[in-house]
């Protein structure tokens, strides 16, 4: 039918052309095609990428993780996670008949799905999977269709999938290739809108599709698949573009080359494909808007116009359209094209003087197929033979080649030849480059005069088949089918023709660099005729034009116009400068040129045909911009002149059937066809043999225009062209995406030895060593040189105020000194009148330092000036360097013990104090009540096998246990020997043990008898000799139980029995009796600091305790922060009225008097009368601090102050009764991260942790590297029982073995007979600790008191215990006795200020206390080093003036001050009269502290010097005399945290603390001694296969796979954001370094030659500090992952140069002190994950502080955690088979307080929910938490777990939280 249609089309076209209506008919067809293209509307499509939230239009919208947008689409990496409900992605209105249009490129070969649609029941409904070599369409569960299409070849693929009914069709090549598959099943009616649409994978745990995707659209109209190329986005054609620096393909007449900018991928030419139809089944040729006429002068013919988007290629009917019509001419040009692209022209009728030249269309396939093979590129071979050379026969086969005759070479024939396999494929010379592989490499430079041939490349396209449909086999003859389609129907070949062999699919260089223009007719060659020609190839036309042509005469061309191109008058020909010799190999050459760039001056060539060259001097870059929109169809132009014969076009798609033609003449009988494939329907008969070919019918009418051809695959890369001139500079491209970080390169060879370097800087000193023993005092040395200024020390804690010193004597005024450096702060001069506040001046420039002046003598104290106004509060200055730690001050006076105040609210838990010395053993306390039984602890590891101990004494008979659960029914035993009937007599002696009997016959199972009464145990007989092991007898029926005999004496101890199989856990036994209270043990070592427990509920207030004895005076603690403003006190009692005093006049201000001795407290006088209001006096000077007065009466109780430091724990008080259970407090917000404190002492050992719950099985990790040999693991779960083995032969009796390891408890047996008490047996070996039993109901009697055991060794440090469950409310306890007075405890560290307490009730008035003795004068502390001058602070805002302070005591006379500057005269007011004294008012509220005023000591009196310029900071002066204590300053703002100071000396012990609260429940006691091992039983029969064991827990990390080859080095990424500051205080360090550099020559170049002087001049502490800082910085730059040198996160270790393996490392996210480093597991296989393991696998607790966790959250972008709940008959997530959550579904609390729950906003991924199966066996439910909000993980609690009972249990298995 196809052949007939083609012939009909040709015939019609030829007839139309013959009638002269060719141009009109072409114009009608072109207009009709334009109308169709402009009116055809695209159906509504669904853009899947846009529905998934990926859009090119939203500028700046962030892409999801793992998705990288680029110009043409999106790149999906392994981290891409795209999932959405099906209803939101694929609307239900689309229906079931869909068309999927795809444009993609795979980057990784795997088995990934491009997409998958799953229903709510998680069944696969629709999916597309790319396998290596296959493309599989999944249409349901286990329903799929596979196509032979390899998507993993690294190329871009544009295809469509049509789903219509029961047919699935793969459409490629823009609709020219269609592979339909009929489904043997029905598809699902519709997609479940409530399901899920997963992009890139089949399920959340499957492998991810990695590649680029330009378009993924779904159309509801299935016809879209046939012309899907019209619906492709224009960016998809540019998806795989590149700019190739190709040289000029054509030379201009002016000689200037031009530049190509080729883009193969844009043209779709990475793998050119052609379709090879059967013989004679192709139309003559196709062009975009024209027709192709044959070269025959009398019968021009044409074909129907094709789709306007379709172009044709050189090579005849076996070509595929290459370019869409939307591309401009510059874009369509490509030197790789083996065809002329564009509209074809009508062939002109050649005159007699014109040589008729024809084009031979040949191909070079990879193989000669026996079936319709993959198409291959057609090449036009051109060769100019010598005139004397005969035409070489073309390599056509006998079955397809028309009859040819050898023509003389008078008409300059150009025969077509194809290289044969026997000949060398390519004759390379040294100058010819090797053919590159099929990639996108540029062509070598080539011109028409170049001597280097242009190799061409032919490729084949992979054959697309389906497993459901086989292509029909092509008819074969005795010879192989031809590699191309012949153009004539003559059956007999010429005698000179040869059979076509398989030409190699290699690049064959041509003999000349000729080129054919894009739209100009190609140079014809003999041996080929246009389609439809009835003449033999090369016969008629060649003979007519042959004699009139000469070898060197140019071939003139008739002027004409090509369709939609420039006139042919613009074309020029130029002779080829080089003519090949006859011996040259004839090779095909690619010819291509755009017609609009050809000139019109023909030049003769030596070979007789023209070479076209470009006209003009304008270079034409191919990629000047993206293709513009499709223009409107223009009006038909006037008919052009006839052109040269066109080359046959590619086969178009099959058109609609035309009208039936008249019956043709009967044709010759054809060969019998092959047997057809069997039909799909069962029972249908096989297809019969194919009938003979019918007679050719009449030519039908031309069909409508075919569909647009698909975009061809990119062709192979040719040789590089010559280097062209550089093109115009392009616009800057978009910023590329950062490439992946390359692997570290190999370690290079060591370089040559360098020259000797300069003397390096002095090395850094190490950390300060420990203090050595104090040596003998040395001889006083000479006064040394002034040392360099040291780094300021750490600020010490504020010491207590010292005593006021005596006033110094007045010194004589010294001589005037040289003006010195500008000092820090001038001394206070005579105070003038207050002047007006001036404006703030500008900051002065820093002056040069002046010379240092001599120290002046002590000046005469100046006259005290008038007090000035209170100054403004200065701005906050920069924090100073830490000062040196102050010495502890003198002890204060012992005060009387005040009255006991009301208990304040509980403050926060303080830090643990230092470990005190162990105290003496106290008296034994009263026996306490037995505590509540704790939860079962974790099972310990199996200890070493102990030696067999001596026989122990017999234990007391225990209470009768509860009956155990009924065991599994055993196999029926052998029938017992029937006893003789008789009266039951006394039991006789037990006879000797007989030999084992032979195996009895298998007896029938007897009826199970009723259970008899329990009898007495008979006496054990004498053990007989051990017999040989007999074969186990077959089980018989259960015999009736015999009567109980009396209990016999215990037998001797038998050998240890074989380890039995682990039985099921028995019921919980009753509670044992409470043991006697043991003696008080020694004080254990301090445990680690426990985790803060949850806030307890408010307890019941206890009775008020007795007044304790007076404790020792404690050392004053450090000054606490200022407390909050207290409430105003209550008014005191009113005193008696005093007499009214006369108003005194205001006297002159006297000098300050000396400090008076403290007077005795006088008695309170009577209240006087109100005096007249006095005149307010002037503000007096601040007096010196007076001596402390006598202690006054105890005032009323003030408001609660801040919480003081926590003292050491006092002696243990008596056990109080349990308080009421307090209410649960709300979780407070996380506080700000505090300053890293000094590492505290090692805490006390924690309690034994409880046994954790079994965690979830984690996801299978990647295979890690081989780790070190680990400790023996716990026993695994029971495996699946294997098949029962055959009975083994009887082995020899083995020697008695050593006692085996403790076996796991076996199955519960039947109740045994109660025996008599046996003698004391030897003590057995120590057994394993049994599992915790359940609480019993009965309470046993107390056991006898045990002996006092020896003091045990110090145990290993236990893990911190869990917070205990809140206890029940206890009974009010009796008042305890006052405890003994304890030793003073050490002062604890300074605590944080507690919350402001509520106002306490007024306490009773205390008695008059005795006057305390004056304290001793403390030793004067050492003088601290002067700190450097601080940076001048910024000007602060003017504060509010504070209220006037109380007048201070009269101070001592100050020293003479310097003469101050004259102040501006202020307004002097007259003094008012003194008023009457007013009524005494109530005490006012305490005002806010006033602003700090400037105060200075009086300076020396000297002449005023000239004001010098402000100098730089001078050297620190000599140590000055200690000054008097200044006024307390205002509380400054919080400074920056200073560097951690060195550990201070241990302070004296503090006061005895209050009685502590009752401690938590202790760990469970040790397991008792193991009982006597019973006798070894005989080997029992094989048991029934056990039930399937539980799924094992997650295994350890596997071995790391071998290191893969290093990937290509990625492009450098964009510059990263500026790095944050290091955790060190850079301001401090920078100032310290600057000070050191400014004040020393250590870093100056001239100092290198004096290293000795440098070392002598520096202090040791400076270098120690520098050395420490250098090591610290080096450890931060290159972390090792150790505890001493941790990394921030594991990813920092992976970025280091050395290769790291998966394992355990130490990290410190906040890079603070190394004491808070945490141990994590680093998973470098998964990109450097930081996996934080829980403390135990059964609890959601992690050993990390909240500060470190906050930093870890900030350093991470995503986190994953797995939690598995193992359950027994317990539902934790969903009930039954539905999707409804259970009533008691568990909830998970995240780190940030959010809740993960079923149906909530945050839900975990539940990959397996086995807990909904309740069949009496253990199951598990796996929860996966994967989030990109690191604040959510790890999970900190699992809530709503149902309570465990005997039949319902659960265990938690908590996996690590892995941060990335």
UniProtKB/Swiss-Prot annotation:
Region listing for Triple-helical region, in residue ranges: 625-1618
GO CC annotation: collagen trimer; collagen-containing extracellular matrix; endoplasmic reticulum lumen; extracellular region; extracellular space; fibrillar collagen trimer
Signal sequence, renumbered to the chain: 1-41
Record: glycosylation sites: 271, 1769
Domain Laminin G-like span(s) in chain numbering: 71-236
Disordered: region residues: 278-608, 625-772, 851-1625
Domain Fibrillar collagen NC1: 1660-1860
Boundaries of every Collagen-like domain copy: 625-679, 688-747, 748-807, 808-867, 871-930, 931-990, 1003-1062, 1066-1125, 1126-1185, 1192-1251, 1258-1317, 1318-1378, 1382-1441, 1442-1501, 1502-1561, 1562-1621
S-S bonds: 1690-1722, 1731-1858, 1767-1811
Superkingdom of source: Eukaryota
Propeptide: 42-624, 1622-1860
SUPFAM superfamilies the UniProt entry points to: Concanavalin A-like lectins/glucanases (SSF49899)
Subcellular location, record wording: Secreted, Extracellular space, Extracellular matrix
Coiled coil ranges: none
Compositional bias segments (type: Basic and acidic residues): 1202-1220, 1241-1253, 1326-1338, 1350-1360
GO molecular function, one term: extracellular matrix structural constituent conferring tensile strength
Biological process per Gene Ontology, one example term: extracellular matrix organization
Pfam family, one: COLFI
Segments of skewed composition (Polar residues): 298-309, 386-409, 509-518
Known role: Plays a role during the calcification of cartilage and the transition of cartilage to bone.
Domain comment, as recorded: The C-terminal propeptide, also known as COLFI domain, have crucial roles in tissue growth and repair by controlling both the intracellular assembly of procollagen molecules and the extracellular assembly of collagen fibrils. It binds a calcium ion which is essential for its function.
Disease as annotated in the protein's UniProt record: Steel syndrome: A syndrome characterized by dislocated hips and radial heads, fusion of carpal bones, short stature, scoliosis, and cervical spine anomalies. Facial features include prominent forehead, long oval-shaped face, hypertelorism and broad nasal bridge.
UniProt-recorded name of the protein: Collagen alpha-1(XXVII) chain
